[in-house]
A protein has these predicted regions:
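Short hydrophobic alpha-helices and adjacent helix-cap/hinge residues
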Residues: 2-5, 17, 23-199
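Sec-dependent signal peptide recognition
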Residues: 8-15
Length: 199
């Protein structure tokens, strides 16, 4: 189900971002799939930004569900996914709601769309290794109100809504408004003040 939610205040996201900037040195994956912001920090920012979505999907029991897509048999993809879900698991609630994290290999756009629709997936996180299938993921989720998040900064310009980068030792959030509109994910305009816009 999709329900209207009450957005958090912008100062609350500023506070989360300030705390996240105190994180450890970045984790890295090889090549053009580089992860520059540690998954623990990504988890904090993901949870904070998701709480601003005003039409977020929820599971039938009202829980926030985060689907983490990995590339099958890819060690870096699996490592980042497990680090992210471990950090999310340490959070008691997201949006003041219970939450669940699921790790699954990407099995095609049709299967992804069905999974999100049947389970009421709130967020799809795309782990390193899946850069080549980003157009398929974006197309599969058009109009779904699912928030897509990329573990790699370059994923934002290639089809996810939210991503993270490290610039001069500071974490930045990247946001793709064009993709946000394509997915029918609603956010207040004020949130863009804290983002680097990438389209």
């Amino acid at each position: 189900m999709s329900v209207p939610t009450t957005s958090r205040s912008l100062p609350s996201l500023v506070g989360v971002l300030a705390l996240a900037l105190a994180g450890p040195a970045p984790a890295r994956a090889g090549g053009d799939q580089e992860v520059t912001v540690p998954p623990r920090v990504q988890a904090q920012l993901l949870a904070a930004v998701a709480s601003f979505q005003t039409n977020i999907n929820l599971a039938p029991d009202g829980a926030v569900q985060i689907l983490v897509l990995i590339k099958d048999h890819d060690a870096d993809s699996e490592r980042v996914a497990h680090q992210l879900t471990a950090a999310l698991g340490d959070m008691k609630k997201i949006m003041r709601r219970p939450h669940r994290e699921i790790i699954e290999p990407f099995a095609g756009g049709a299967a992804l769309a069905l999974t999100c629709r049947e389970r009421g997936i709130s967020v799809v996180y795309v782990a390193p290794g899946l850069g080549g299938v980003l157009p398929e993921i974006a197309q599969a989720l058009r109009g779904s109100a699912v928030l897509t998040v990329g573990g790699v900064a370059a994923f934002v310009s290639r089809g996810v809504v939210l991503g993270f980068d490290l610039v001069s030792g500071r974490a930045e959030m990247l946001f793709n408004p064009t993709q946000m509109r394509a997915l029918n994910a609603h956010f207040p305009a004020s949130i863009f003040q804290l983002m680097r816009i990438t389209e």
